[in-house]
Regions:
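Substrate-binding cleft and catalytic face of glycoside hydrolase catalytic domains
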Residues: 51-69, 77-201, 250, 267
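C-terminal outer-membrane/trafficking sorting elements
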Residues: 367, 372-374, 381, 387, ...
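Boundary/entry segment of secreted carbohydrate-active catalytic domains
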Residues: 22-59
Length: 508
């Protein structure tokens, strides 16, 4: 079979860009904003990267071990690709990192300090010669938690390589090796903004103060241009907004700009991730000292994949947290104003245990940023309902189905559903055949119900499942009803203690 070449090209174009999943944004999320919103880059995170982010940090390709795993054999391929992508699309580029206690070449530990210093200088100089326009550089990464000084990092089984001695070791300040690293960085990268980067700082005031001690040493020599806090999910989750902001304030008191450098928001369930994004991200973005935020991956396959930190699904669909993020950054959030619940087939009755009824929620306005809802049913011993709104009858009775908006407004919609079980009928004649309703149509809401000797409960519902009136503990054969309602079609539910039945009535 032959296929038109143009059609084939269009097919593969759509496939390669992910447009089968969802239309791509025209510009990066933070385009035109006073602070950047970026992401870690790797081959696995490359697809449509420039459509979302205006800042790029190579996740692993710019680390010393990735570039010079074998001594004197430089592999620049990954960093070249990252740098080229950033420059092509006008994205801010940040080198990550120069000095760290992890992911440095394994061979560095076997050298004497003189040779180590020579190799460090060579690493700096070759970077500077090859990449002349790096806006930001993480000079030292994780000095408190993962230093190249022979320490045993938290959770590790082996001590780090000690090449800090080649940079002066602890020295008089306790942090001479950090200061030397920044002096070297200022020498080789005079036009780049130099950053000190660390994790799990802002969840602890004690750690924040220790971090500031190093920062002030660097400030004294005019060596540091910004403060990096990774702000991974394991730092922010469980830490109050008050404490996060208070520690950001302490860092800001140094007078330096702050960069949240490796942010991720966990959540295998969309509503969980959205809730945490709405809680954490505004603390960062709205802080006057924060000048940029970098997510540590956004696609499936990122480093916290099992925790669900990705913002775009495998199918290329943006998760609600990402949709909210874009709207928040651009101040275009539209909150829900109403939620209406109905069944997809218009029914308000499930007449057999184990049967299902598909529910739907209409969220208005139609352009609500987050139109998703959470489904619940009460009492829960009578029915269950799943995340897609499929109600399953468990026991006879009346349940209230509720749809609650995810957008934080608390908007809810409800509908009552009657559950009966035709197999429990005790009369040879169907319950509905024993009951008469007249006149039908009813004028001005006046009508009479006969044949209700066995009936214990009568309820009147409108077409969207809203209960209008109810009569309980009945012990009579006739009931005269008068209701003040709008003209329309209504449903009368009858319950005899074992089964439900219903009749429609027109009220004029």
């Amino acid at each position: 079979m032959k296929m038109n070449k143009n059609l084939l090209f269009i097919f593969f174009l759509f496939l390669s860009t992910g447009l089968f999943g969802q239309a791509l944004p025209v510009t990066p999320i933070a385009a035109g904003q006073s602070k950047f919103l970026g992401c870690a880059w790797s081959n696995g995170q490359n697809l449509n990267f420039q459509s979302y982010w205006n800042q790029l940090t190579p996740e692993n390709g710019s680390k010393w071990a990735s570039v010079e795993g074998t001594r004197e054999k430089m592999n620049w391929a990954s960093m070249d690709a990252a740098y080229a992508l950033a420059k092509k699309h006008g994205m801010i580029f940040k080198q990550h990192p120069l000095i760290w206690g992890a992911q440095q070449p394994s061979w560095i530990g076997a050298l004497d300090t003189t040779s180590q210093r020579k190799e460090i200088e060579e690493w700096f100089s070759q970077l500077a010669a090859r990449y002349k326009d790096m806006e930001y550089i993480d000079v030292v990464n994780e000095p408190l938690h993962n230093a190249p000084n022979g320490m045993l990092p938290w959770g590790a089984t082996n001590k780090n390589v000690d090449y800090a001695k080649a940079l002066g070791g602890a020295g008089e300040t306790g942090w001479d090796w950090v200061i030397t690293s920044f002096h070297m960085a200022r020498k080789y990268f005079p036009n780049s903004k130099l950053i000190l980067n660390e994790y799990s700082v802002i969840n602890s005031t004690e750690t924040t103060k220790k971090y500031i001690e190093i920062i002030k040493l660097l400030q004294a020599d005019g060596l540091i241009d910004g403060i990096g806090e990774q702000a991974h999910a394991f730092t922010t989750k469980g830490t109050s907004a008050t404490l996060l902001k208070a520690n950001l304030d302490l860092l800001a008191a140094t007078g330096l700009p702050i960069y949240l450098t490796e942010v991720d928001i966990d959540g295998l369930k969309d509503d969980v991730q959205l809730t945490e994004m709405r809680r954490v991200f505004p603390i960062f973005w709205n802080h006057p000292a924060v000048q940029g935020i970098t997510f540590w991956g956004f696609r499936v396959g990122l480093w916290r994949n099992t925790e669900g930190a990705y913002l775009v699904t495998q199918a290329g669909v943006e998760r609600p947290a990402l949709k909210w993020l874009r709207a928040f950054v651009n101040d275009t959030i539209v909150n829900s104003q109403s939620v209406t619940v109905s069944s997809t087939d218009g029914s308000t009755v499930v007449d057999k245990l184990g049967s299902t009824l598909a529910m739907t929620a209409t969220v208005l306005p139609v352009n609500t940023t987050i139109p998703n809802v959470t489904w619940t049913v009460s009492p829960s011993n009578l029915a269950t309902i799943d995340s897609k709104g499929i109600l399953t009858a468990v026991a006879v009775g009346t349940v209230k189905v509720t749809a609650t908006s995810w957008d934080g407004t608390g908007r809810k919609g409800t509908m009552d559903v009657v559950i009966s079980n035709s197999t429990t009928a005790t009369s040879e004649k169907p319950l509905a055949d024993l009951i008469t309703v007249y006149p039908n149509p009813a004028i001005n809401g006046n009508f009479t119900i006969n044949g209700i000797e066995r009936i214990k409960q009568i309820e009147l519902f409108d077409q969207v499942g809203k209960k209008v009136i109810a009569f309980n503990h009945l012990n009579q054969s006739t009931l005269n009803v008068q209701v003040n309602v709008a003209p329309g079609i209504y449903v009368i539910h009858f319950f005899d203690g074992e089964q439900f039945s219903y009749k429609k009535i027109i009220i004029r």
